[in-house]
């Protein structure tokens, strides 16, 4: 009897419209989190996606490097979402100008990630170091071969140690990163995005339920002869 009572309660709970809405929202959150942590495993890096915040990797066209114009050129624009894949340092392509664009921790500031292209490689005491440069930095813009003086001055010009490399950029999605930048750079950005998400949930799930409950109950037709 207790088992039947529990089953009846669960069945009644499942029929509750608000409970169903909560379950749907929970599933959406679980899918988002599952995608993020799952992509970490698949791409073999703790940072599977990043947003381009500066124009150091962008080559200006007609003076524009804002992420909205020429979005599909072979450079990285502000507002791009980058897909990053973990890779063994020895497997990186160092043949400039077609070398890999890598993501690495800034020397001396491990909390900051840098996205630049490899321009040269050297081995010191059995460890690989990579000289890097932003495609849009300096006078020699990619794909022009830059002089050593335009290499990034990391660790006194020695380059980036293989231990600091997070991965390489394998793909990018234009424009959508501006949402992330808006949240980071604007004090009210995150509250606005959260409010929009809540509003969409209300319009999509909650409002239809409220309207459904307000519908008048249809009167049963009276059978003839009663």
Descriptions of predicted regions:
Residues 52, 101, 114-120:
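Short beta-strand-centered aromatic/proline hotspots
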Residues 79, 98-100:
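Loop/turn positions that initiate beta-strands
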Residues 119-178:
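Extended, hydrophilic extramembrane loops/domains of integral membrane proteins
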């Amino acid at each position: 009897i207790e088992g039947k009572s529990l089953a009846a309660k669960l069945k009644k709970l499942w029929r509750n419209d608000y409970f169903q809405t909560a379950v749907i929202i929970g599933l959406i959150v679980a899918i988002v989190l599952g995608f993020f942590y799952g992509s970490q495993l698949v791409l073999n890096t703790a940072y599977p996606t990043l947003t381009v915040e500066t124009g150091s990797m962008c080559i200006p066209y007609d003076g524009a490097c804002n992420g909205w114009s020429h979005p599909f050129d072979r450079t990285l624009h502000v507002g791009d979402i980058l897909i990053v894949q973990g890779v063994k340092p020895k497997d990186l392509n160092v043949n400039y100008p077609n070398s890999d664009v890598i993501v690495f921790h800034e020397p001396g500031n491990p909390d900051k990630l840098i996205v630049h292209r490899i321009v040269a490689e050297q081995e010191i005491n059995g460890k690989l170091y990579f000289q890097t440069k932003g495609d849009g930095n300096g006078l020699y813009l990619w794909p022009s071969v830059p002089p050593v003086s335009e290499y990034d001055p990391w660790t006194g010009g020695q380059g980036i140690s293989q231990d600091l490399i997070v991965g390489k950029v394998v793909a990018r999605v234009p424009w959508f990163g501006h949402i992330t930048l808006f949240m980071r750079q604007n004090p009210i950005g995150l509250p606005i995005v959260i409010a929009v998400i809540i509003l969409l949930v209300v319009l999509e799930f909650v409002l239809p339920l409220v309207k459904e409950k307000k519908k008048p109950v249809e009167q049963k037709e009276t059978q003839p002869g009663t």
